């Protein structure tokens, strides 16, 4: 499935990518599944500000209404934070279903990397990489 027609890149992110300026992709699962509201939203916005303060453009990535989003507004981050675990934790295998159902998804590391690559973003920061568990 070619997902590029479903990709929305925020104007600020698109301009930075086109100009060769630094852009940092951020996953969104940490917002919906990693912390309780409102700390999740406060932390996400603070991380974006730290990136800005250091001369780069943040691009938090998620799937909203079936659209792959590279760069969220503060309102979209708030939406994900309030919905919390009601939002699908979206891995690679979930993309086609979420897009076809016009559903929401908070992106895991894998999905964030895929969408970031589609948007021309080469740098990615995360709060942690899962998949390794004791017991």
Feature roles, as predicted:
Residues 1-53, 118-119:
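N-terminal glycine-/serine-/threonine-rich phosphate-binding loop
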Residues 1-9, 97-109:
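A short, flexible low-complexity segment enriched in Lys/Arg and Gly/Pro that occurs
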Residues 3-6, 61, 130-135:
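Glycine/threonine-rich beta-strand-loop-alpha-helix active-site module
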Residues 9, 13, 31, 76, ...:
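Glycine-rich, flexible loop/turn motifs
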Residues 25-29, 62-64, 117, 124-126:
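Short beta-strand segments
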Residues 28, 33-35, 41-99:
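Glycine-rich nucleotide/cofactor/substrate-binding loop typically near the N-terminus or early
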Residues 102-135:
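Glycine-rich anion/phosphate-binding loop at the beta-strand->alpha-helix junction
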